[in-house]
């Protein structure tokens, strides 16, 4: 597209400057012409007049560079034209890109409300021929373009094997897998090889510290000699060398865990017998290497933080299930050389005991841990190890520590970061209270996820942040068996305050949130659902919202556990969040997510099936490439034997990418059956990808047959249930807003089904009607109310005809009773700036159904209004340049009654008052926020009294229920 900005004054001045510099005969040094006109861009050699390397292209080059004669002035004038045209095209392209970026930034600077977004889509549909034509064309174009991009990326990756597409971590891990099968002594000698590169040049002393640990596990061997002093100097001065060593040392710890798994099955009795003699050297090591580890932490804090953490508190395992140990549990066993025998002995002893309760630490170990923590506190502790948090994936925990240190350094160094404060880990805040927590019912998870390893395990992230999370909050709210009681949440809150031994920034925000003024469980649940809705619309914004309110830990491992454990998250949006290559935090979360998965002894396509069951691998080709790359890295780590079958580990990545293309081609409805990929086509596409060699034909045939029999699918989420409801509704679909239009798609990532019930529509409340007349089936979503009528009943299914739909924003619920309708419900519209009008009247079959439905409806209305209020405040603060503090939304809490209904006057005041908004945004104390909320409170004729207890979401029980 031609851009008018190309003829701007800035572009013209740049062109004139380019022309002047060329006339004067100076060497060109601008960015636009460097790559083409610099002598270094061409090889030395004889030049022929007709070649592209003719002296005509060197008219501006100095004579001393290549000994070329620039020619007479007339020739210079003639040959300057290609240079000027090329510069003009580059500058024009830059101006066009700047204009596109500027237009995008302007369009994204203000976020429209949901109804205006629907209206915007509606106008586009009208412009391009109507809803059906537009959506069909858009779907076809998008599918074709994505398929084209995927094929293009695959060809690029297939033809550029020499680029080493996989990250250096996997390449290094592939080289180091030789050590993991040669013996544990070589593993441990290489484990600290990267850590010898430190500012203090204490590599030899560190090797002396490590040798007793290696001797504990096997016969004494000689460690690798430390690098020469010249290597140390180069490592200090060259950032790239230091980074490569750092990555190498990090990846070696993963290989240690892999080697440890085989050792545990073969040498467990010998290690049990050697536990007694291991204890004393380990205790001596605790006192010796604290100082050395401190010095190393200064240069490699992200490498040694988890080692400090492990030496301060030896891992105390919980009861383990009877199944085989996962990769996370085996990773626990060899985090530090001296701590490994103790863990094995404890785990072995615990397996014999076969207890179902949490294993408490002995008093001596507790006192030892207290003393060690006082003597040597780690620089950064996000979630310190404890009895109830050992079952967390330690690989992910270490990943969060080592990655988070980079964020803390970028925030201003150790002194500037709240988490690096010297008093953040005071000894007085170290009580060990986790075993007192009552065990909660287990949450069923897939066996490969090392999140809740056994039936009664409770991870620390879940125990700390789960009181605002239950199934009624998360997804469809149709299951009420896991709803937490308010009393239990308050008791867990009090225990949680004692459990956390480190004070962090977000923990302080959590303390403020748990104060008595904001301890209302209803509001907490509402804000958690708002965070889920924001995530399902814009994942980064949702994660930030949940972190600010303390629902999710502010670490990559905490966010990874949240994405894998919690319901109510769109798997499509999880893939969007994890596939974001622009933000380092998202990439670290993706690494932690794949670290939670164990692909050992699995075929590549089956491992990819397990990965895609939790994350939807679909969308932009670059995001798909990023997800497949992370999966391939994890698969290489879990299956070193499979990797050694190939000449290059990149082959795993190429093959996984080809499997995704095969699955898309085989099950896409847009591909005709005769054009679907055949087995020979699949094999032909993968010829020579393994450094010129072919992948074994038997392997490719097995992959093709398994994909042909069973599609790679993503597990169901809350969107799946909405899609089922959408398929049951025939006729015109809901419009999704208060504006009349052509309709919209019902199933969206942020939309979830709250409840379904049967009511009777009342055309005129003052006139009686026959019993059972105007029967309506009501589907209540979190932002939409859909009224349908049974269209056709079959033996195993039922279809509904669409009648009406209403947006929940601005809706009010009123109750009425008369001699004709004892359980009347009236829905009115009270959007600020619009007239109040009656939307529809219903009559419930009984008072219980009316109460349940109105409670759910009022809470959903409050959720929508709170989201809109959050959007408006964010936009106003963005326009005014006011930075919203993390708890500014608390100013709106007191404006809401217990059931969550706001009056129209309250909405008008809250949205129109600029000064009040500014004050609430800048309020720094909870008292100010409370008083501001009390001043803005209004009575609502349609709201229930504040003393009415909120009923959690429960499904009503009509004759027909959607599952």
Curated annotation (Swiss-Prot):
Q: Name one GO molecular function term.
A: guanyl-nucleotide exchange factor activity
What InterPro entries does UniProt report for this protein, alphabetically? IQSEC_PH, PH-like_dom_sf, PH_domain, Sec7_C_sf, Sec7_dom, Sec7_dom_sf
Span list, region Disordered: 21-88, 312-332, 349-513, 922-947
Location within or outside the cell: Cytoplasm; Nucleus; Postsynaptic density; Cytoplasmic vesicle, Secretory vesicle, Synaptic vesicle
Phosphotyrosine: residues carrying this PTM: 911
Q: Positions modified as Phosphoserine?
A: 89, 105, 107, 180, 249, 253, 512, 515, 892, 924-925
Query: Which tissues is it found in, per the record?
Result: Expressed in brain, ovary, heart, lung, liver, kidney and leukocytes. Moderate expression was also detected in lung, skeletal muscle, placenta, small intestine, pancreas, spleen and testis.
One Pfam family named in its UniProt record: Sec7
Q: Which residues form the PH domain?
A: 774-866
**SUPFAM superfamilies named among the record's database cross-references:** PH domain-like, Sec7 domain
Instruction: Report domain SEC7 positions.
Output: 517-710
Sorted alphabetically, the keyword list is: Coiled coil, Cytoplasm, Cytoplasmic vesicle, Dwarfism, Guanine-nucleotide releasing factor, Intellectual disability, Lipid-binding, Nucleus, Phosphoprotein, Synapse
* Residue ranges of domain IQ in the record: 134-163
- Bias-annotated ranges (Polar residues): 29-38
SMART domains found in the cross-reference section: PH (SM00233), Sec7 (SM00222)
- Principal localisation: cytoplasm
Could you name the Gene Ontology cellular component terms for this entry?
centrosome; cytosol; intracellular membrane-bounded organelle; membrane; nucleoplasm; postsynaptic density; synaptic vesicle
> Low complexity bias located where?
471-489
Basic and acidic residues bias: start-end ranges: 366-376, 430-446
Residue ranges that the Swiss-Prot or TrEMBL entry lists as coiled coil: 848-879
Gene Ontology terms: biological process: actin cytoskeleton organization; dendritic spine development; positive regulation of focal adhesion disassembly; positive regulation of keratinocyte migration; regulation of ARF protein signal transduction
Q: What does this protein do?
A: Guanine nucleotide exchange factor for ARF1 and ARF6. Guanine nucleotide exchange factor activity is enhanced by lipid binding. Accelerates GTP binding by ARFs of all three classes. Guanine nucleotide exchange protein for ARF6, mediating internalization of beta-1 integrin. Involved in neuronal development. In neurons, plays a role in the control of vesicle formation by endocytoc cargo. Upon long term depression, interacts with GRIA2 and mediates the activation of ARF6 to internalize synaptic AMPAR receptors.
Tell me the protein family, please: Belongs to the BRAG family.
Q: What is known of its domains?
A: The PH domain mediates interaction with lipid membranes that contain phosphatidylinositol-4,5-bisphosphate, but does not bind membranes that lack phosphatidylinositol-4,5-bisphosphate.
Which disorder does the record name? Answer: Intellectual developmental disorder with short stature and behavioral abnormalities: An autosomal recessive disorder with onset in infancy and characterized by intellectual disability, developmental delay, short stature, aphasia, and hypotonia. Additional features include seizures and behavioral abnormalities, such as inattention, hyperactivity and aggression.
Please identify the protein, giving its name as recorded. IQ motif and SEC7 domain-containing protein 1
Q: Which organism is it from?
A: Homo sapiens (Human)
The gene designation is: IQSEC1
